[in-house]
């Protein structure tokens, strides 16, 4: 008890005494109440060894380069080996480090261009290398062309066993047009089927590249890869820029982070940018405070400054919340310098060429589907989005893509990353309608295509898009490929042999035929040895019509398609027979028809369930028999007139599936 009283007295006296603090100097900052965090707090962090090394490297020892090639020629694997050689990642067990999406790793393709900065010591001096791993497929050509803006050269990669392919040719001309220094590289020389001499001859004949400058490597085993980095240093030019001039910063790409908002991948042409700088967009006029700058090494690694010639990332504080504000190709500068600089040439906006409709399998999942699509759109603004509604399938979306692979990858990401259960309609292409009053209209939704009466009365001309397709394949399959192209309404433009056994064939084809599994048919005709690339070739007048599916004379709005008149009969018969398989029998007759306007081109009938009304009759009662059968017939007519055909969602899902 006595101890408790002593404790209480001590606490009471301590509470009554005035607090004593150490004297504060007037010059000393107050430690107790300074809770504000300056915007440039990042610049006060201790400087790392990495940052010291980068700061000591002048711009003439910067090298910005990318790897371009046909799909599946080993770009991502070669990137892994280069990152290991420069010590950016630890060797062993690395597989496509720069392919960050699940769908990229699953399919073994690059969808999104990825970047990484490397430090390389060559002859006693540090070099700052910036690598871009680009997609190889034609659908992601926009990613490739944007990557070239941040590069001074490119490694042109060719598979030693396959040789020059269609997209090798296309990527070469893209890089050549940008003025990039090209270094030929032959990959996969370790394969038993490798023929590097043939590949070198093809590169010399097709691109006029000197075979003596080529480097022969195996990215998988690492054979000879160490020779690539000295070649990059010696052959690829340094970027041009001046860090003392006003800031000129090109937005190359962007992606969305839940915590940091929109993150920008930028190339600094002049000047420098730090955390805390106040910058503005020349395209939108919006202004932002820089929250952090850094490089990809290989993940996001913060730095105190990005200088002229560097490629890195920045994000803002407060964050940029709307990805629409980040216009790829935009120029940024410091606030107050807007009139001192000229905007950098931007990029051509990619146009959607393939359209599909997407509906949730369960109508109640529409909000979840909308949420999932919007999240994916934050990182891929080349997709167009428009809400639409179908009587058969309910609320959904009309989505526009750069190509069929682009569409397929998006669908896979919806299913894998967001668990979406969706119904996707077959891909369609846009069509142009020229009206009699001179107006032109692009139709992307078959349901909005003019009906037959309007076509006759108000339309002057219908046009469809064509593409110039470049096909490369062994000479032995030439006859089959020409036959395939001709059957798909193609027109031959050129034919050349770039080796004794390899052919480059160019055809103008309707885009509608190309998206209708043309590549699959091409692979089948050539046992998988053909490759395909294409570019837009403009619009052409065409005889096209809207094919509709009718169930008991009522159009099914979810199933309509604009096709060439030569395909109407064949496709109509396929439709009605396939749809019949998935529609359940009703109490009345169901008639399935394919029609163009009022013209019925194909028909199938689903017989009704039949009740035996004669079961209790005497065999000789002919009059009564006839009377009951007539009554049943009249009842079915009435039921057919007032009854609705019930078509389950799974029927549409099965019908629309490939």
Swiss-Prot record:
Domain tr-type G: 60-240
Binding-site list for GTP: 69-76, 133-137, 187-190
Compartments it resides in: Mitochondrion inner membrane
EC class of the enzyme, as a word: hydrolase
Role: Promotes mitochondrial protein synthesis. May act as a fidelity factor of the translation reaction, by catalyzing a one-codon backward translocation of tRNAs on improperly translocated ribosomes. Binds to mitochondrial ribosomes in a GTP-dependent manner.
InterPro entries linked to this entry: EF-4, EFG_III/V, EFG_V-like, G_TR_CS, LepA_C_sf, LepA_CTD, LepA_IV, P-loop_NTPase
The protein's name in its UniProt record: Translation factor GUF1, mitochondrial
Keywords: GTP-binding, Hydrolase, Membrane, Mitochondrion, Mitochondrion inner membrane, Nucleotide-binding, Protein biosynthesis, Transit peptide
Family: Belongs to the TRAFAC class translation factor GTPase superfamily. Classic translation factor GTPase family. LepA subfamily.
Domain of life, per lineage: Eukaryota
UniProt lineage: Eukaryota, Fungi, Dikarya, Ascomycota, Pezizomycotina
Transit peptide: 1-40
GO BP annotations listed: positive regulation of translation; translation
GO CC terms, sorted: mitochondrial inner membrane; mitochondrial matrix
Enzyme Commission no: 3.6.5.-
Gene Ontology MF, one: GTP binding
Gene: GUF1
PROSITE patterns linked to this entry: G_TR_1 (PS00301), G_TR_2 (PS51722)
Membrane-topology annotation of the record: Peripheral membrane protein
The reaction(s) this protein catalyses: GTP + H2O = GDP + phosphate + H(+)
Chief localisation class: mitochondrion
């Amino acid at each position: 008890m006595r101890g408790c009283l002593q404790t209480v007295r001590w606490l009471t006296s301590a509470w009554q005494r005035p607090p004593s603090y150490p004297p504060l100097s007037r010059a000393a900052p107050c430690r107790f109440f300074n809770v504000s965090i300056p915007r440039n707090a990042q610049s006060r962090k201790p400087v790392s060894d990495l940052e010291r090394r980068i700061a000591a490297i002048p711009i003439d020892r910067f090298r910005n380069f990318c790897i371009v090639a046909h799909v599946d020629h080993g770009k991502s694997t070669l990137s892994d080996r280069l990152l290991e050689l420069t010590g950016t990642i630890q060797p062993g067990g690395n597989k496509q480090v720069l392919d960050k999406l699940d769908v990229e790793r699953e399919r073994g393709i690059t969808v999104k261009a990825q970047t990484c900065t490397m430090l390389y010591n060559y002859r006693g001096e540090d070099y700052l290398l910036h690598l871009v791993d680009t997609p190889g497929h034609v659908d992601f050509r926009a990613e490739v062309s944007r990557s070239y803006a941040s590069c001074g050269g490119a490694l042109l990669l060719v598979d030693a066993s396959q040789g020059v392919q269609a997209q090798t040719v296309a990527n070469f001309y893209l890089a050549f047009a940008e003025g990039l220094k090209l270094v030929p590289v032959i990959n996969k020389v370790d394969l038993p089927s490798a023929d590097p001499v043939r590949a070198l001859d093809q590169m010399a004949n097709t691109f006029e590249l000197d075979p003596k400058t080529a480097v022969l490597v195996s990215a998988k085993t690492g054979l000879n890869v160490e020779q690539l980095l000295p070649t990059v240093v010696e052959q690829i030019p340094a970027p041009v820029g001046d860090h003392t001039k006003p800031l000129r910063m090109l937005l190359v790409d962007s992606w969305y982070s839940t915590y940091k908002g929109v993150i920008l991948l930028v190339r600094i042409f002049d000047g420098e940018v730090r955390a805390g700088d106040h910058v503005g967009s020349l395209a939108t006029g919006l202004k932002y405070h820089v929250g952090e700058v850094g490089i990809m090494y290989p993940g996001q690694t913060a730095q105190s400054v990005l200088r002229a010639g560097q490629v890195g990332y920045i994000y803002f504080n407060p964050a940029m919340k709307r990805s629409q504000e980040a216009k790829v190709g935009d120029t940024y500068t410091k606030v107050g310098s807007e009139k001192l600089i000229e905007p950098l040439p931007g990029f051509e906006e990619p146009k959607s060429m393939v359209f599909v409709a997407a509906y949730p399998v369960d109508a109640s999942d529409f909000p979840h589907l909308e949420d999932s699509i919007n999240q994916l759109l934050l990182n891929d603004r080349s997709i167009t989005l428009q809400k639409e509604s179908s009587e058969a399938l309910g609320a959904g979306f009309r989505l526009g893509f750069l190509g069929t692979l682009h569409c397929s990858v998006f669908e896979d990401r919806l299913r894998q990353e967001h668990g979406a259960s969706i119904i996707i309609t077959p891909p369609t292409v846009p069509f142009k309608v020229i009206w009699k009053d001179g107006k032109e209209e692009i139709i992307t939704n078959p349901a909005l295509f003019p009906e037959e009466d309007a076509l006759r009365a108000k339309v002057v001309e219908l046009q469809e898009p064509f593409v110039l397709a470049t096909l490369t394949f062994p000479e032995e399959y030439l006859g089959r490929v020409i036959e395939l192209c001709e059957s798909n309404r193609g027109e031959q433009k050129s034919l050349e042999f770039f080796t004794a056994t390899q052919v480059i064939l160019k055809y103008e084809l309707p885009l509608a035929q190309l998206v209708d599994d043309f590549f699959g048919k091409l692979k089948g005709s050539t046992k998988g040895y053909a490759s395909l690339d294409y570019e837009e070739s403009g619009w052409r007048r065409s005889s096209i019509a809207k094919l509709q599916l009718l169930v008991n004379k009522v159009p099914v709005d979810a199933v309509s398609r604009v096709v060439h008149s030569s395909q109407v009969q064949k496709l109509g018969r396929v439709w009605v027979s396939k749809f019949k398989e998935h529609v359940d029998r009703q109490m009345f007759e169901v008639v399935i028809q394919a029609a163009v306007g009022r013209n019925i081109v194909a028909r199938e009938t689903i017989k009704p369930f039949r009740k035996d009304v004669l079961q209790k009759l005497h065999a000789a009662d002919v009059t009564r028999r006839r009377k009951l059968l007539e009554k049943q017939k009249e009842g079915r007519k009435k039921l057919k007139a007032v009854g609705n055909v019930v078509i389950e969602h799974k029927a549409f899902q099965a019908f629309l599936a490939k």
